[in-house]
Amino acid sequence: MCSLAAGNGQGAELGPEPLELSDSGDDAGWEDEDADAEPAQGRQHTPCLFCDRLFRSAEETFSHCKLEHQFNIDGMVHKHGLEFYGYIKLINFIRLKNPTVEYMNSIYNPVPWDKDEYLKPVLEDDLLLQFDVEDLYEPVSAPFTYPNGLSENTSAVEKLKLMEARALSAEAALARAREDLQKMKQFAQDFVMNVDVRTCSSTTTIADLQEDEDGVYFSSYGHYGIHEEMLKDKVRTESYRDFIYQNPHIFKDKVVLDVGCGTGILSMFAAKAGAKKVIAVDQSEILYQAMDIIRLNKLEDTIVLIKGKIEEVSLPVEKVDVIISEWMGYFLLFESMLDSVLYAKSKYLAKGGSVYPDICTISLVAVSDVSKHADRIAFWDDVYGFNMSCMKKAVIPEAVVEVVDHKTLISDPCDIKHIDCHTTSISDLEFSSDFTLRTTKTAMCTAVAGYFDIYFEKNCHNRVVFSTGPQSTKTHWKQTIFLLEKPFPVKAGEALKGKITVHKNKKDPRSLIVTLTLNSSTQTYSLQ
């Protein structure tokens, strides 16, 4: 949110006439006298962008802004390469948000006004919106023109345009460098200082999301359909049940916290296993159905239900002995619910307590499915006789969640991430990893698939493990597929070396950005 300026841009008093933008000579004086001769009620005035002064033209306004506020509209337009619509959005953004000049001058790409909502005029008959922004790209004075049509400063203008283009490119490169530098600083700080999970910047990404920002996520879990799908996933639900029922010593007479309890199935398993008290927390509307379910099963004396985010609610106890949660998303980390579990661990888990599941791994495997690749990518080359190949740029960067036929696998799997929920921190959930895929077939590599495995191990008399991989029983998580823009041939026995980087989307920290490098090619994917 930008800081607010002192003025609101809606003043009514016309100040002294400022200097003109350009030196128009003696003619300017005659024009001013003519303007003064016009009836006062016929004049059209426009307010300054940063104070309540009124002016008769856009040029006067811009001159005032430059002299009095150190805001150069010419420089702003050239700095960001603004054309007609970009200029309109800029003016309306300033009118609507009232930012300070310091804030405006500090902006680098991407700009905050690049939204369609700023095409709507804030002021009726705003003279600044009637200004032709192309004038700012023209020479200030008209040069002498020779009979052949060439002007005396043609080369200078061309040089100026070239310099402006280079300046814009340098601005963009500088912005990227600053962003990279900030990431490096944060990484170094986390690595050296081992920042506590309650204070590191990644922690607050999810914890600090406001209700209007996170509403879609929680509302999606308010409908019974998604819970029905999860409950019917036997691999998932029976693994939790078997872990709890086959290891009752972990729950007997213990205080248990269920983070994101949904319908309360894990809480009821824990209660049946002998838990002294189960505290079940969920922000979604499904909690009201969970209350009825708990009463129907006569477990209300053991299970306490609390509606809200674990980062915001107050629990009836200071510490718990066990934390259970089914937090896994597509590619394990999608939706960033593990952040909330780690927050709960940091704040509520007693010394010597346990979090389940406790061990998780993410793996990659190479895929050869030429027909599937053609169906999604080559399809756009000829759509009813029309070339729509430009659509590939939108299709390829989206990771696909679907079941991979195990017959299409052409390599051994490779683990790229190992998570121990007892020791990991939120900053660890954004990572880079080198990997090697050893091919088992001679084929065309068309994609890389990702999946995860879950382990219930700590203090377990009966260890429970399940996999979401393509060679295991299908789960509702399926697999996450990263289609390659350019498939390439491989021979059995090859070692495909690559690198993967996973981090949260800054605009939506519950979604993921995945960058994959393989066969000397790099592609960035979104999972949202």
Swiss-Prot record:
N-acetylcysteine PTM positions: C2
One GO cellular component term noted in the UniProt record for this chain: nucleus
Tissue expression profile of the protein: Ubiquitously expressed.
Residue numbers annotated as active site: E326, E335
Residue ranges the record marks as coiled coil: none
Phosphoserine sites (modified residues): S22, S24, S169
Keyword match Ion transport: no
EC code(s) of this entry: 2.1.1.319
Reaction equations catalysed: L-arginyl-[protein] + S-adenosyl-L-methionine = N(omega)-methyl-L-arginyl-[protein] + S-adenosyl-L-homocysteine + H(+); L-arginyl-[protein] + 2 S-adenosyl-L-methionine = N(omega),N(omega)-dimethyl-L-arginyl-[protein] + 2 S-adenosyl-L-homocysteine + 2 H(+)
InterPro entries with a match to the protein in the record: ANM3-like_C2H2_Zf, ANM3_Znf-C2H2, Arg_MeTrfase, PRMT_dom, SAM-dependent_MTases_sf, Znf_C2H2_sf
Residues that bind S-adenosyl-L-homocysteine: R236, G260, D282, S284, I310, E311
Region of interest (Disordered), residue spans: 1-42
Biased amino acid composition, Acidic residues: 23-37
Record keywords: Acetylation, Cytoplasm, Metal-binding, Methyltransferase, Nucleus, Phosphoprotein, S-adenosyl-L-methionine, Transferase, Zinc, Zinc-finger
GO MF annotation, one: ribosome binding
Regulation: Inhibited by N-ethylmaleimide and high concentrations of zinc chloride.
Principal location: cytoplasm
Annotated region (Mediates interaction with ALDH1A1), positions in chain: 184-528
Residue ranges annotated for the SAM-dependent MTase PRMT-type domain, each copy included: 214-528
Summary of the function given for this chain in its UniProt record: Protein-arginine N-methyltransferase that catalyzes both the monomethylation and asymmetric dimethylation of the guanidino nitrogens of arginine residues in target proteins, and therefore falls into the group of type I methyltransferases. Catalyzes the asymmetric arginine dimethylation at multiple sites in the Arg/Gly-rich region of small ribosomal subunit protein uS5/RPS2. Also appears to methylate other ribosomal proteins. May regulate retinoic acid synthesis and signaling by inhibiting ALDH1A1 retinal dehydrogenase activity.
Record's subunit section: Monomer and homodimer. Interacts with EPB41L3 (via FERM domain); the interaction is direct and inhibits the protein-arginine N-methyltransferase activity of PRMT3. Interacts with the 40S ribosomal protein RPS2. Interacts with ALDH1A1; the interaction is direct, inhibits ALDH1A1 aldehyde dehydrogenase activity and is independent of the methyltransferase activity of PRMT3.
Family: Belongs to the class I-like SAM-binding methyltransferase superfamily. Protein arginine N-methyltransferase family.
Protein name: Protein arginine N-methyltransferase 3
